[in-house]
UniProtKB/Swiss-Prot annotation:
Function: Catalyzes the reversible formation of acyl-phosphate (acyl-PO(4)) from acyl-[acyl-carrier-protein] (acyl-ACP). This enzyme utilizes acyl-ACP as fatty acyl donor, but not acyl-CoA.
Principal localisation: cytoplasm
Protein name as it appears in the record: Phosphate acyltransferase
Native source species: Chlamydia trachomatis serovar D (strain ATCC VR-885 / DSM 19411 / UW-3/Cx)
Sorted UniProt keywords: Cytoplasm, Lipid biosynthesis, Lipid metabolism, Phospholipid biosynthesis, Phospholipid metabolism, Transferase
One term under GO cellular component: cytoplasm
Catalytic activity: a fatty acyl-[ACP] + phosphate = an acyl phosphate + holo-[ACP]
Family membership noted in the UniProt record: Belongs to the PlsX family.
Length: 321
């Protein structure tokens, strides 16, 4: 199937041309595969820069009146009705796109997406879901920044979404998956009152599939397939993990074998998925460089082609008990 993907050129910490270069690399790498139709959203000054590129013949460019900056408040972002982010989400909502990718302001993207894109029925709150490499493959962790403070019911919703996501990508419909609650210790009594209540609810709902509390170090061991956490803790965990990998890559350099670098390179995974929406929205890190943008865009294509949001909706209904 042809995938129609929208990309927000604006709002990240990088130059918009970095996104443009990543798009070119994705198009080159996908030669011979099923076609991909890109639509990019950029301000007029960036649009003029892109028109001289040979790539402009292969990519549709939509001119935006403005863009959402990292410094914009939510109110300011919402008021920018013709921003690159808003226009991209409008096109997604209208069915003109199969997915939308942005590396802009996270809070603005989540808020605008939630206001424009219908939620999957029975999902209490959206969450940012990201894949992280482990010794046994990969795990998904959510939430990593959509909502700072959540209640136990919402955490259970995250668990169901994470399970539905893993199930939707599995070729084996009966494959078992395990869950863990990110906490300051593995003992049941650890954590806040909210964590303790969430622990009890997850144990009652998921039974033996819930392996209890896990500490940050357990995530990379592959002990569990789905890690449940609130957006504040999850975001701190994710940025710490990314920073540690970058530190090791810088310190060890060429002494790290390529296969090891690839195994623990978070940039080869898609960006964070705003899970819970009925349409695909991917948030790339604002500081994403070319490789991470390539991974985010390529991953978005794969997820759109797999119709992952519809499959999550189907699976989510099965997981509500």
């Amino acid at each position: 199937m042809k995938v129609r993907l929208g990309v927000d050129m604006m709002g990240g910490d990088h130059d918009p041309l970095v996104v443009w270069e990543a798009l070119g690399e994705v198009l080159l790498s996908s030669t011979g595969e099923q076609p991909v139709e890109f639509t990019v959203f950029a301000t007029s000054d960036v649009h003029h820069q892109l028109m001289n590129s040979p790539l402009s013949r292969s990519v549709r460019i939509v001119t935006a009146e403005d863009f959402v900056s990292m410094e914009d408040s939510l109110l300011a972002a919402v008021r920018k009705k013709r921003s690159s982010m808003a226009l991209g989400l409008d096109a997604l909502q209208q069915g003109d796109l199969d997915g939308f990718v942005s590396s802009g302001n996270t809070a603005a993207l989540v808020t605008l997406a939630r206001s424009k894109i219908p939620m999957i029925p029975a999902v209490p709150r959206p969450a940012l879901l990201v894949s992280v490499p482990t010794l046994s493959g990969f795990a998904v962790i959510l939430d990593v920044g959509a909502t700072v403070s959540v209640n136990p019911d919402e955490m259970v919703g995250f668990a169901r979404m994470g399970l539905a996501y893993r199930q939707s990508l599995s070729s084996n419909s009966n494959q078992p998956f395990t869950l863990g609650l990110l906490n300051i210790g593995s003992e049941e009594r650890k954590g806040t009152d909210s964590h303790k209540q969430t622990f009890r609810m997850l144990r009652n709902i998921f039974g033996s599939a819930f392996l209890g509390n896990i500490e940050s170090g357990d995530v990379f061991s592959g002990k569990v397939d789905i890690v449940v956490t609130d957006g504040f803790t999850g975001n701190v965990f994710l940025k710490t993990a990314e920073g540690l990998f970058d530190f090791l890559r810088h310190i060890l350099g060429d002494r790290l074998e390529k296969s090891i670098k690839m195994q623990f390179d978070y940039t080869i995974y898609p960006g964070s998925i705003i899970s819970g929406l009925s349409r695909l929205v991917i948030k790339c890190h604002g500081k994403s460089h070319g490789t991470a943008l390539f991974g985010g865009i390529s991953g978005a294509i794969d997820l759109a082609r797999a119709n992952v949001c519809s499959r999550i909706a189907d699976r989510f209904g099965d997981n509500v008990v």
